[in-house]
């Protein structure tokens, strides 16, 4: 039997770079919220112990894909602790709607959905804490998708505190370029010393993203989309880009602006949600 699992997008409602560690990783403070929009992952169990991704991503080797890596990591971890039946495997396919290099967390969300779904389907019985710890080895954003609640993140993104920001409507736009994260983080002009503040203080301040100035400087497409959106509503970069978003109080307001968008702007309207669609589907 084939089962389907949501793999939602996320937005960074704000993102501040507070420092850089000796190992090169940047410390940050950011606010994650999910969208009721994303990819869909389909899973069909196998009994021969094999993991097969039926919808390969162009330019990504099978074993390098985060979906396959997540499945194999769970398989090994559960098997090593005697919590996996012999022969457990899976055919996995994905209906991909989220762009790569968009700052919407697509790959991390895919990995988290696979961890949560296969833990359930294989009846491994691993806790969310265990799954989140495994997820962190796959990517800094994976744990928030595993835990499934909007969160304030610190450290390199792994220290999570659940929060409940307002669930607004967003017009999310893709400028048509992909921005590799290192391009932003290696830029010498990236702000790296934004003062650390408490969650309470940050939630009262106007939200912004320290990466935005670099993305706008290096990618004229990002600058053009943001300039257009800012004529209608508060708008920011999410993550390190390339996607940007404008926030609205109602769905109709967001859709009215999208209808006016120039032909070169690709976008969609989605609601911000504090409980991940993946976890909502499991209730």
Curated annotation (Swiss-Prot):
Instruction: Identify the keywords attached in UniProt to this record, alphabetized.
Output: ATP-binding, Isoprene biosynthesis, Kinase, Nucleotide-binding, Transferase
Q: Which organism is it from?
A: Escherichia coli O1:K1 / APEC
- GO molecular function (one): 4-(cytidine 5'-diphospho)-2-C-methyl-D-erythritol kinase activity
Report the EC number(s), separated by commas if there are several: 2.7.1.148
- The answer to whether the entry has keyword Magnesium is no
Record: residues binding ATP: 99-109
Q: Which HAMAP family does its entry note?
A: IspE
Report any Pfam family annotated for this entry.
GHMP_kinases_C
Catalytic reactions of this protein: 4-CDP-2-C-methyl-D-erythritol + ATP = 4-CDP-2-C-methyl-D-erythritol 2-phosphate + ADP + H(+)
Protein name as catalogued: 4-diphosphocytidyl-2-C-methyl-D-erythritol kinase
């Amino acid at each position: 039997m084939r089962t389907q699992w949501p793999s939602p997008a996320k937005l960074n409602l704000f993102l501040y770079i507070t420092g850089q560690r000796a190992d090169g990783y940047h410390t940050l403070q950011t606010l994650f919220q999910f969208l009721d929009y994303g990819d869909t992952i389909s899973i069909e169990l196998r009994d021969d112990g094999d993991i097969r991704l039926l919808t390969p991503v162009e330019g990504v080797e099978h074993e390098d894909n985060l979906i396959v890596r997540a499945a194999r990591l769970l398989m090994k971890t559960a098997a090593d602790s005697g919590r996996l039946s012999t022969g457990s495997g899976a055919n996995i396919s994905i209906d991909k709607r989220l762009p790569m290099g968009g700052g919407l967390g697509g790959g991390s969300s895919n990995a988290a959905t696979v961890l949560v779904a296969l833990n359930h389907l294989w009846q491994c019985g691993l806790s969310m804490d265990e799954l989140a710890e495994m997820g962190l080895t796959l990517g800094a954003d994976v744990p928030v998708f595993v835990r499934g609640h909007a969160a304030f993140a610190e450290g390199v993104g792994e220290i999570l505190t659940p929060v409940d920001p307002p669930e607004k409507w967003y017009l999310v736009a893709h400028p048509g370029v992909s921005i590799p994260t290192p391009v932003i983080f290696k830029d010498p002009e990236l702000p790296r010393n934004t003062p650390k503040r408490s969650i309470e203080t940050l939630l009262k301040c106007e939200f912004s993203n320290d990466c935005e100035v670099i993305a706008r400087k290096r990618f004229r497409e990002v600058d053009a989309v943001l300039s257009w959106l800012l004529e209608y509503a508060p708008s920011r970069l999410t993550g390190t880009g390339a996607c940007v978003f404008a926030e609205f109080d109602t769905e109709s307001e967001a859709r009215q602006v999208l209808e006016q968008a120039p032909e070169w702007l690709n976008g969609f309207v989605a609601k911000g949600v504090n409980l991940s669609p993946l976890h909502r589907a499991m209730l």
